[in-house]
Amino acid sequence: MQYVGRAFDSVTKTWNAINPSTLSGAIDVIVVEQEDKTLACSPFHVRFGKFSLLLPSDKKVEFSVNGQLTGFNMKLGDGGEAFFVFATENAVPRELQTSPIVSPTTSPKQTPSINVTEPQDLELDKVSQDHEKDQSNTYLMEDGYEFPLTRDLIRRSKSDADQTPPTGFKHLRHSSCLEMAGSDRTPSMPATTLADLRLLQKAKELGKRLSGKELPTRVGDNGDVMLDMTGYKSSAANINIAELARETFKDEFPMIEKLLREDEEGNLWFHASEDAKKFAEVYGHSPPASPSRTPASPKSDSALMDEDSDLSRRHSLSEQSLSPVSESYPQYAKTLRLTSDQLRSLNLKPGKNELSFGVNGGKAICTANLFFWKHNDPVVISDIDGTITKSDALGHMFTLIGKDWTHAGVAKLYTDITNNGYKIMYLTSRSVGQADSTRHYLRNIEQNGYSLPDGPVILSPDRTMAALHREVILRKPEVFKMACLRDLCNIFALPVPRTPFYAGFGNRITDAISYNHVRVPPTRIFTINSAGEVHIELLQRSGHRSSYVYMNELVDHFFPPIEVSTRDEVSSFTDVNFWRSPLLELSDEEEDDTNKSTSKSPKTPKNTKFGYQEFEGIDEEDAQDYSPSPLIKSFNELMFEGEEDEEGEEDVENAV
């Protein structure tokens, strides 16, 4: 039952990883300090599931390093992928275009404020200092609203308009006011009279009566108060409400009818008093506000209406065409990398750093690791499925039920490799949605007290189904691995003959092809099969076989220790090169003599009928060296003569 429970939980987690709606994860990042002390990084691949982001407004991703928030926020795309946003003046391709992240620093620039503006309907703040000069033209009510006293506008002369051309205008119409902002006109209002105050008091009482509880009302989205007109039936309640509204407006209708007048152009004119209305009908404009103001030349109503209609026609023009200076707005583009200065501001520590990406105030978080290396750190690549596990498919299945299905000795071998000064990197074709489960699996491997060393886990940024389709159906996992390794070579920025990858472990020929693509020597490409037999790719035809356990005994031979202190030293100061005796200096004559001595024909041996070897090509001078000495020659003759005499005596005796 324990295995069944583990299998059910693991299948649920696996389904969540496969389901695009719940897929979330982040790939580890590698930051390299290059030879010129600049920093370069691999892409920041982060993806959030749709169920983790219930609100479409959750677009801002907070990015933190080692628990400290950074100022480089990310933005979420439609598919849940996160990316950085930067502004540029250059042209941006359509697939890389985006909008800026919502923040005070990236908000669009506001247009310059105009001197004369229309007060907002629900503005409850105090009047700003910019409008203090217009206080004589308005009356501040008890509830904080500004009520204009008159709506007649006195125009300046054409000479003044020619001297100060307008920079823009906005023709605003309201139910209770008409203001022309940004134009070459300045409002001039009459002095406040007792009749005006009585009129304002009546308006206040009317507002209070309209806002009573006996009238069913509601406030719209734009702040307007509307009567409840639901039902569209002539019921008794509706009749009573209509009668109440009629009684409410009965006393005010004559006054409103006198104050409002509709002209030929459809404009509404609102006068402060009857005196102002009569003055406008006689002279064509309102009386002057004070003696200090210079009155404009009187104009007829027809001239004023013609000018207003002309402004209405010009209102259709865009504000951009009327602006004196055209501003160039920056373009915003997507990116997955940070610059060298931005990486340096993260205050990274050598080795492992923790990353976290949070959305919606930390309710949805993805974690990853960042490894800070140097350009001269040798890197060992290791596959996961089939290389650390015993097989591709069974490695996934037995991991789901909690059974160990790893090769024996792999933890100790990788630990010894890292102890000798090498960096380990885990490369797999799994999708980014399996990042957390893959890191959890590697972290929990333990064999005889040894665990796998820490290293970046590089996965495919594709979705789970796309990654499985490429690896299982198309059988081309090397497409992703080759592209990934090429990108990592670029961030190390080493010369072409050199490569940052020292060795590679895999289980297929596709892994060997990927490692060979980034110039890993064939003598250091190790392939392991499901039986645990390791062979070198170059010696595969020779039948050479080994295992992780036997490689532990020769780990210093395959991966010699690298001293950190002497890693950057020149090779001429090693023990072999520094302590050996220097080469002899030969003159030209000595070199000619040595060439003559070596030009003689070699002395090749020749077998005789007695089995001895004689040398051909021997000169007469050299033949004396191989002839026996006189002493040896006389000794041999005496020995042979004695033997002949004994043989003769024996023959004679036999004959007798």
UniProtKB/Swiss-Prot annotation:
Alphabetized GO MF terms: magnesium ion binding; phosphatidate phosphatase activity
Alphabetical GO biological process terms: endoplasmic reticulum organization; fatty acid catabolic process; lipid storage; nuclear membrane organization; triglyceride biosynthetic process
Phosphothreonine found at: 106
Biased composition (Low complexity): 291-300, 596-609
Functional note: May have a role in the maintenance of the nuclear envelope structure and in minichromosome stability.
A GO term from the CC aspect: cytosol
Protein name according to UniProt: Nuclear elongation and deformation protein 1
